[in-house]
């Protein structure tokens, strides 16, 4: 069984008297920094001097400094920067200030697990990862609740790494819901697999394949959009609220029968074998190497595919139909 930690297992005293640098002020950065501050902890946000978010963080009542200045001040450094720039920023702006006994932490294990960042042996290294987007982390904290999270220790120099990590998790509200103990390897590899095979890559290709199949067969693109993309939210919401069983209970018997009989023809053994291959390429570092190499040459393949995907007919049809949906945020 996975070990789960709650409020009673965590003590904010392990962070009292320590300065916490939160590097980045995006989705997770703003939520974590504000919640830590509201938990009575000493926080500084680290940003580029020319960052558009500098004034936003100041307006939110937070101390802001450049990344090197924030790291120089802090005993705990939380790196909430995009995966592809963390290695460079670490080498240039974090490592010079990572003195003995400090703590280096992350909310995703990519750069530690794949060796893009190799911290000195005389610091703590751990991970605290809320399992929700930043706006929900912040909202739940403000309501006196929390979202589930993960905690992992990569390096325990001081003997207090897990205590500090759990204190941080408590400071952002996660221990109210429960914090699951994991490892950098498990967090990183499962996160990447979920994104690639299911949540992003898998779902995107399934939607487009369904849309294309209907349009190629002569059906109206608008009908194809409704059936293969728009209604997905209705199904996902049911799954999110109560699992696959809730969804199957809520749909018609015809839909449920089609689920059981046809689903395995779409995701068949060939698909499952390809998923196993995708996982192997994550585990052996192939994906990480490809992504790092892509960034080193300014992402030509990434940018070309991104542009091509933006020009898929489903985007034009969807833009028109969403104009007819006043409940959607523009």
Swiss-Prot record:
One of its GO terms (molecular function) is NADP binding. Substrate binds at residue 252. GO terms for cellular component: cytosol. Binds 2 magnesium ions per subunit. The keyword Cytoplasm does not apply. GO terms for biological process: isoleucine biosynthetic process; L-valine biosynthetic process. Keywords: Amino-acid biosynthesis, Branched-chain amino acid biosynthesis, Magnesium, Metal-binding, NADP, Oxidoreductase. Involved in the biosynthesis of branched-chain amino acids (BCAA). Catalyzes an alkyl-migration followed by a ketol-acid reduction of (S)-2-acetolactate (S2AL) to yield (R)-2,3-dihydroxy-isovalerate. In the isomerase reaction, S2AL is rearranged via a Mg-dependent methyl migration to produce 3-hydroxy-3-methyl-2-ketobutyrate (HMKB). In the reductase reaction, this 2-ketoacid undergoes a metal-dependent reduction by NADPH to yield (R)-2,3-dihydroxy-isovalerate. This is Ketol-acid reductoisomerase (NADP(+)). It comes from Desulforamulus reducens (strain ATCC BAA-1160 / DSM 100696 / MI-1) (Desulfotomaculum reducens).
